[in-house]
Amino acid sequence: MTSQKSSLAVLTVGAIGVVYGDIGTSVLYAIKEVFGSGHVPFTPDNVYGILSIFFWTLTVIVSLKYVSLVLRADNNGEGGLIAMLALASTAVQDRPELRKVLLLVGIFGTSLFYGDGVITPAISVLSAVEGLEVISPTFTKAVIPTTLVILFGLFAMQKHGTAGIGKFFGPITIVWFAVLALLGVSQIVTHPEILFALSPHYALMFMWENPGITFIILGAVVLCVTGAEALYADLGHFGKKPIRLAWFSVVMPSLVLNYFGQGALLLSNPAAVKNPFYLMAPDWALIPLVVLATLATVIASQALITGAFSVTKQAIQMGYLPRLRILHTSVRDTGQIYMPFVNWGLFVTIVLAVVMFRSSSNLAAAYGIAVCTDMLITTILTFYVIRYGWKYPLALCIAATSVFFLVDFAFFASNLMKLFAGGWFPLVIGGAVFTLMITWKQGRQILNEKLRTDAIDLSSFLDAVFVSPPLRVEGTAVFMTAEPGIVPNAMLHNLKHNKVLHDQNLFVTVVNHEVPWIGMDKRLQVESLGHDCWQVNIHYGFKNDLDLPRALQQIKNRGCQLEPMTTSYFLSRDTVIPTIGSGMAAWREKLFAQMHHNASGAADFLNLPNNSVVELGSKIEI
């Protein structure tokens, strides 16, 4: 029992550091953006109304939707939009048209994650460093250079992994939330009546009396729940209980106290709207607070960068992106990965965002629309999981999701008003990634269909070859095939040029599934083809690490004597030639061909030993 409690405590601390970093740094800019917009006159009733809207937004979207409902929709213990998409698409398997629509919606939501991934580090770090302006206006010119230096350091350290410093994330973030609570309480004691704003009465009265203003400010209010989707995305790392315990015991109380403290400060000093978070602190605490806020925003950004690596890897294994170079940064934790292309691509785009928008207030206009779209998509997918996956009655499904849908849609509609003020930026990024993903998926389908059309049946081919067998050489040849039962081009080239076959020949197909994990006991499916040849299907979930040599070690129990030192891996390196009439627009054909050309080699992706790989090229017209 003691060890279970200890484990729960460790996981809860870890969840506070990783899951809640983003939502925990929203206090830096959320209240400032609502009151600083000029749409809300400074009256006590308006302050009460806004604080009440903040509290009930946190309650409805985070406590009720994500913590109470969405966390239940785990995919074999895993969460995140891709896991939810896999659940929903499986649930409507017998409805192909609906499944196609849900897949497109889910992939679009996944693409928007990258748009959010650019804005979050930019606005978080920038808003923390803007505390320097509160210390002294002379620091104003240093804000952007300092932000860029911090961001560069953050991205430069990714290749070294975060295993060493990651253990400090939880404790630092706990200190951050404790400081949030203390700052809030220090102001609330001057206006304890501010706590009356916990009543929904004030939110409802504000919305009733100011419907137009309410609609406008929802675009800023949503900033208090940015990062809520991380609760679900990190489900597999920490589990439901630690995430829920962290939210209700530490995170939500600290956030509410801080927001209400900022409200109390504004009642005393409306001029504090220029930066209410930092102005709650005494002068002597400003420098330490800026340092702590910067650390908190770096941790929040780190969680998002790690999430970008993870989501990209999952998308690759589900066939929506080409192979990219993946480096493991930890020997003990295979989930610790580094993807150079994703890392520096994010960095360049984030730098562009900081230089273009130049302040957290300007970035706030760009923030929200991608998050709201993802929240809306999550609600839609949750409905289909509950209805068709869990088989709940339609009326109950509508009751469970309709309120969340209406709330999400209200925030989404409000954020559309920010489209031309900066909201276009994450949408352009998300749209570009979406185009890449659907182009790659469709291109691979066309390419595989072309390979099937030109394919030679493997079993018949082997029977014909062994009528007059070529020279056999010692060792084992592993031929990779896109689909089982067809002759790989690498084998045809090997016979044509080398005129030999190995003593043992394995025809290996990697089969990726829409589930997070497939255990080693279900990894291999082996069929003997005779002549010391085997068809081997290796099954992976989208969160499994691909390690072909390790998986093939199991074949020793199936009659094949596989020795690493005498095993050669034959790969086909195809060059795609775009042609007219493939079913894709000409520009998308060229885009697919370029993506195919630039894809990382299969050898690295499958963890094959470099000194045992033979690549043979061919050209394929699509």
Swiss-Prot record:
Compartment(s) where it occurs, according to its Swiss-Prot or TrEMBL record: Cell inner membrane
Keyword tRNA-binding: no
GO MF, any single term: symporter activity
InterPro entries given in the database record: K+_transporter, K_trans_C, K_trans_N, Kup
Keywords: Cell inner membrane, Cell membrane, Ion transport, Membrane, Potassium, Potassium transport, Symport, Transmembrane, Transmembrane helix, Transport
Membrane-topology descriptor: Multi-pass membrane protein
Transmembrane segments: 8-28, 50-70, 101-121, 137-157, 165-185, 213-233, 247-267, 285-305, 337-357, 366-386, 393-413, 419-439
UniProt entry tagged with the keyword Membrane: yes
Short name of one Pfam family: K_trans
GO cellular component: plasma membrane
Catalysed transformations (reactions): K(+)(in) + H(+)(in) = K(+)(out) + H(+)(out)
Top-rank taxon, per record: Bacteria
Protein family: Belongs to the HAK/KUP transporter (TC 2.A.72) family.
PANTHER family, A to Z: LOW AFFINITY POTASSIUM TRANSPORT SYSTEM PROTEIN KUP, OSMOTIC STRESS POTASSIUM TRANSPORTER
Function statement: Transport of potassium into the cell. Likely operates as a K(+):H(+) symporter.
Name of the featured protein: Probable potassium transport system protein Kup
Organism: Polaromonas naphthalenivorans (strain CJ2)
